Amino acid sequence: MKHKIAILSDIHGNATALEAVIADAKNQGVSEYWLLGDIFLPGPGASDLVALLKDLPITASVRGNWDDCVLEALDGEYGLEDPQEIQSMRMTQFLMERMDPATIVWLRSLPLLQKKEVAGLRFSISHNLPDKNYGGDLLVGNDTEKFDQLLDEETDVAVYGHVHKQLLRYGSQGQQIINPGSIGMPYFNWEALKNHRAQYAVIEVEDGELVNILFRKVAYDYEAELELAKFKGLPFIEMYEELRREDNYQGHNLKLLANLIEKHGYVEDVKNFLEAIKSEYKMD
C-alpha cells in the first residue's frame, strides 16, 4: 500500500498560502497531512485558517513556539516593558477577536513530539527539538551532531519545522532528516533565491520504504493576502507588508517595534486585553 503524506509547517497566519498549498497537495494525490506547528501569527488567519485545517485528514500535530507565545499571552505571562511581549499580546488580542476559544483548548492539547509508524517505517515529528520548540539548534548550517538530537534508535526518519527552510540531510548514523520549509513565511539568506511561494513537502511510503521525498514551492496571490490583512485591521501591518513584498520580517528589531507601538497606541490596547484575559480567555 502506498502512503502519500503532506508535511505542513509554519503557516504563521497566512491562510491564502495555506489554501494554495492544500490545492496543490490534493493535486499530488496526498492521503493524509502532518502539521508541525506555528499555525497563527503574524498573519491575519484565524477562524478562516482553522476551517481550512479542519477539512483535512490530519493524522499528526505538534505545537510550535509561536503557538506557545499565544498561550503565554493568554495566560498573562507577558508585561508592558518588552516591545516583543507587547507585540505578542496585541497580535494575540487580534487573533482571539476572530477565533473560537475552543481552538485554544486544542492548541494546548498538542504535544511537542509525536511518533508515527507508517508501513513499518518509524517517524519522529516535532516543531524543533523533541523537547524544545524554540531556539537555533537546528539551523540548516549546523553540524550533524546538532541534528542527531532529533534521532534515537527507534527513529528512521525525523521531520521538523521551525527554521523556515527546506532541508534534506542525514544523521551521523544514516537516518533521514526532512524539513518541509514554511508555508507562511519562508526565510532566505541568498538574494537570488528569494521568492513569494509557499513551501511544504510530500513524502511517499510504500511497503515500508521511503520511496519519494518531494519539496514543493507553490505560487499564491501574496498581494491578496496583504489586502486581506489590511481589511481585517492586522496590527503591525507595516511589518507584514514588508514580509509579504520583500520576504523580510523584522520581528527582532526592537526599535521598529517600539516606534510602531507608540505610533498606533498599542499599549492601551494591550492594557485592555490584560484585563479581559483575566476572566475571558485564561483557561486552567
Task: Please state what every model-predicted region is.
Residues G174-D284:
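Acidic, His/Gly-rich catalytic cores of divalent-metal-dependent hydrolytic chemistry
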Residues I39-L56, L71-E81, R169-S172:
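Metal-dependent catalytic neighborhoods of phosphoester/phosphodiester hydrolases
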Residues M1-L56:
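N-terminal active-site segment of His-dependent metallophosphoesterases
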